[in-house]
Amino acid sequence: MWWGALSLLFWVPVQAAFLKMETVTVEEGQTLTLTCVTSQTKNVSLQWLAPSGFTIFLNQHPALKSSKYQLLHHSATQLSISVSNVTLREEGVYTCLHYGSSVKTKQVRVTVLVTPFQPTVEALVLRRQNGEKSVVLKCSTERSKPPPQITWLLGEGLEIYGELNHEFEADGKICNTSSMLIARAYGKNSTVHCIIQHEGLHGRKLVAPFQFEDLVADQETSDQETSDAPEQSSLSSQALQQPTSTVSMMENSSIPETDKEEKEHATQDPGLSTEASAQHTGLARRKSGILLLTLVSFLIFILFIIVQLFIMKLRKAHVVWKKESEISEQALESYRSRSNNEETSSQENSSQAPQSKRCMNYITRLYSGAKTKKSAQHWKLGGKHSRVPESIV
């Protein structure tokens, strides 16, 4: 916690008595030494911060558990540390803080140099239909920071520049550099040197010689086999499309030329099979890429139409199903209401049937009783009438 609190002091505005910015340049793989000195001797604490803002050392106490950071010297007035095997990750601004009656700040900007590799020279012989020949030279070096300077040293000490090409890697810091030169005339014993100059070399130069003697010998051998095929050591056909410098070289002299028309003619001559092949390959790739893109677009369009038709069919089926479900629900409700009505009427009929039957029985009994009574009365009256005449007589 207290390491973090002390690290945050770097980002908070402080009352700095002085602010110094030093610049230190170190080569990749070497050891970086950082020294912080103060004139105060009492109640002083010294702290080194990494470019990321984290504490490296507070007095003699290490804060980062890394073997790259070592304590060289600590006293009341000095704190010296070292960073071993420096890489591009260690590049940036390091800060020293003096904690006393006031906070003093010292900053050191560290720049890491990456020295280039030993250069290599490649050659390509171009032969045109009219019999003229020229040699394309390419000098390449890899992995440097900053980009190096490449020159060509001709036979009698004449140093010229070629056409530079820088290609940076993904980090945007490391650079791969090449230089191209066209030799339109040269002798069998001529020699050309590719020279690399860089800050990390401290005045030294990286030199790669190229002798035309070997090229002429190979050329004579190839002339016996075929007179029209171009000879290539290890240079790709794409390199021919880049603009290059043109020179003429003889055995004991070197004269620079700047004939743009001949250079363009040598580069764009349709008789060169390598260039024609490269153009044909590029055109074929472009056509195949366009055809593939068109086919993919057409397939995506067809798939989109199929999906839309499927969605429309699904919606139509859903509407039909919804209507059918509504009709079935209405029929079910009607059937249920009809069943309820029939049950109610049947229950009413069943409840009225016993009552009517009892009424009929009651009426039948009354009728039979009344009939019996009437017949009895009639019989009595009949008996009386029969006896009256006899008494009268």
Swiss-Prot record:
> Residue spans with biased composition (Low complexity)?
229-246, 342-352
Name the domain of life.
Answer: Eukaryota
Molecular functions per Gene Ontology: signaling receptor binding
The signal peptide stretch is 1-16
Q: Which GO terms describe its cellular component?
A: immunological synapse; plasma membrane
Where is the sequence biased in composition, kind Acidic residues? 218-228
Point out the glycosylated residues in this chain: N85, N176
Disruption phenotype annotation: No visible phenotype. In the small intestine mucosa and under steady-state conditions, severe reduction in the number of intraepithelial CD4+ CD8+ T-cells and, partial reduction in the number of lamina propria and intraepithelial CD8+ and CD4+ T-cells. In intestinal CD4+ T-cells, expression of gut-retention molecules Itgae/CD103 and Cd69, and gut-homing molecule Ccr9 is reduced. Development of lymphocytes and myeloid cells is normal. However, in older mice, the number of CD4+ and CD8+ T-cells is increased in lymph nodes and blood.
Residues on the membrane's Cytoplasmic side span: 311-393
Q: Where are the transmembrane segments?
A: 290-310
Which InterPro entries does the UniProt entry name for this protein?
CD80_C2-set (IPR013162), CRTAM (IPR053096), Ig-like_dom (IPR007110), Ig-like_dom_sf (IPR036179), Ig-like_fold (IPR013783), Ig_sub (IPR003599), Ig_V-set (IPR013106)
The annotated regions of Polar residues compositional bias extend over 247-256, 270-280
Q: Where does it localize?
A: Cell membrane
Bias regions of kind Basic and acidic residues — which residues?
Answer: 257-267
Instruction: Provide the membrane-side ranges marked Extracellular in the record.
Output: 17-289
By sequence similarity, the record places it as follows: Belongs to the nectin family.
Tell me the subunit arrangement: Monomer. May form homodimer (via Ig-like V-type domain). Interacts (via Ig-like V-type domain) with CADM1 (via Ig-like V-type domain); the interaction competes with CRTAM homodimerization and CADM1 homodimerization. Interacts (via PDZ-binding motif) with SCRIB (via PDZ domain 3); the interaction promotes CRTAM and SCRIB polarization in a subset of CD4+ T-cells.
What is said about the domains?
The extracellular domain is required for the regulation of IFNG and IL22 production, but is dispensable for late T-cell polarization.
Name of the protein: Cytotoxic and regulatory T-cell molecule
What organism, scientifically named, is this protein from? Mus musculus
- According to the entry, what is the taxonomic lineage of the organism? Eukaryota, Metazoa, Chordata, Craniata, Vertebrata
**Gene behind this chain?**
Crtam
